[in-house]
Amino acid sequence: MLLQAAVQNRNVPLASSASYSRLLRCRSPVVSVAALSKKTAAIVCSISQVYGYGTVDYERRPIVQWNAIYKKISLMEKPELGAASVLNQWEKAGRKLTKWELCRVVKELRKYKRANQALEVYDWMNNRGERFRLSASDAAIQLDLIGKVRGIPDAEEFFLQLPENFKDRRVYGSLLNAYVRAKSREKAEALLNTMRDKGYALHPLPFNVMMTLYMNLREYDKVDAMVFEMKQKDIRLDIYSYNIWLSSCGSLGSVEKMELVYQQMKSDVSIYPNWTTFSTMATMYIKMGETEKAEDALRKVEARITGRNRIPYHYLLSLYGSLGNKKELYRVWHVYKSVVPSIPNLGYHALVSSLVRMGDIEGAEKVYEEWLPVKSSYDPRIPNLLMNAYVKNDQLETAEGLFDHMVEMGGKPSSSTWEILAVGHTRKRCISEALTCLRNAFSAEGSSNWRPKVLMLSGFFKLCEEESDVTSKEAVLELLRQSGDLEDKSYLALIDVDENRTVNNSEIDAHETDALLTQLQDDL
């Protein structure tokens, strides 16, 4: 098979440039470890979409299909050129873009988590204010995107510069969502009070957003308090309110309370439980070991799928993987392929992830090879799953071979890719090679949204101490300083590193590195 050939011929450079395997060679003895097979169920929390596409435009619906523009932007070979390059090229070809088209493109980009490109489209429109009249709804969407891409300070500055007549409940809700995403509790609670005073907290959205914050902070009693306030003020719970409430009850480990909420949901004539309702319940049942109830909930998920909606299938694939039910996993996969014309990278990712978690590496490799000729783009998250499994099984050379294959195929290694390899070299006690991988992780595209796992750093520092390698330890500390990670005191405390401390540990704890790889697998 293609993957096997790539791994078996690692001495032959697969990429036009020097292959990774020739740059990093470690011949130290492998730390003997029994790989852990612990399976963990990913917690799924239904979070309301803060804003849908609601821009009202005076323009007539254009004949030109917006999805042609979307595809050009989303499949750019050089995304660093920005969405503006695509839009300028489109207009130079004599095709005038309309606001309706551009807002529809933004909607699709947001749907697939391409916030940076969506914001670039809005920036392009803002630079042509004489052509594109933007509304308060547009401002709310832009604020949400700015918060995701540029951070809270820029989002606050954008909010302050808006005309007062633009600062409606949608814009306030967008800023609230930005605070919640950043887990900025004090600012979120203060803004909610302002929204209460202005009469902007008379609908479910701000309460749903705050419930999400308290869920993320594991303050489940606060979720109940939000529900109580809504009922006190006769604010009807919507489907998102119920789904978050269900997730909160499940996170407390209470089957009875979760099922009681579901009964309330069923008795609410304005609510029809959707597939998210049952995927949330299935997730919680899996977490609590209620296999039969989980499988019943998953059947209800499947029954609620309408049209060619792909997302529910991704949840089904992931959750059947958490159950370890390979038969149902493949059945859903074949159904999925029969109802949609093409499966996106996320679909293949869900299947590969489940197979890896079930220990079926050979099956995961087959799916990887099936994905290669049909992929929309080379997504490093998919091979990362396999590389992580190889490293966990002490097959670093196999992981390096897949890395070389990724580069040959035009894939761009992510920070997580390099982190996985760094773990592999740490397990083999190769400090120099692990340090090289960490340097590459900090310089990889998108590294500003990444920081190394606590267990990764603890293991590396422990190895440095055992080998009396102060220089390598200091090199990683400098990388952390430059990235700003050392400014986070809670993160620093978890790493438990004192630059002047020397610890005499007998050996690297193999179980710790296995736990790290399990954590990496869940994040991938």
From Swiss-Prot:
<dbReference type="InterPro" id="IPR011990">
    <property type="entry name" value="TPR-like_helical_dom_sf"/>
</dbReference>
<dbReference type="InterPro" id="IPR002885">
    <property type="entry name" value="Pentatricopeptide_rpt"/>
</dbReference>
<keyword id="KW-0677">Repeat</keyword>
<dbReference type="GO" id="GO:0009507">
    <property type="term" value="C:chloroplast"/>
</dbReference>
<feature type="repeat" description="PPR 7">
    <location>
        <begin position="379"/>
        <end position="413"/>
    </location>
</feature>
<comment type="similarity">
    <text>Belongs to the PPR family. P subfamily.</text>
</comment>
<feature type="repeat" description="PPR 3">
    <location>
        <begin position="238"/>
        <end position="268"/>
    </location>
</feature>
<feature type="repeat" description="PPR 6">
    <location>
        <begin position="344"/>
        <end position="378"/>
    </location>
</feature>
<feature type="repeat" description="PPR 2">
    <location>
        <begin position="203"/>
        <end position="237"/>
    </location>
</feature>
<feature type="repeat" description="PPR 5">
    <location>
        <begin position="309"/>
        <end position="339"/>
    </location>
</feature>
<feature type="repeat" description="PPR 4">
    <location>
        <begin position="274"/>
        <end position="304"/>
    </location>
</feature>
<protein>
    <recommendedName>
        <fullName>Pentatricopeptide repeat-containing protein At1g02150</fullName>
    </recommendedName>
</protein>
<feature type="repeat" description="PPR 1">
    <location>
        <begin position="168"/>
        <end position="202"/>
    </location>
</feature>
<dbReference type="GO" id="GO:0003729">
    <property type="term" value="F:mRNA binding"/>
</dbReference>
<dbReference type="Pfam" id="PF13812">
    <property type="entry name" value="PPR_3"/>
</dbReference>
<dbReference type="Pfam" id="PF01535">
    <property type="entry name" value="PPR"/>
</dbReference>
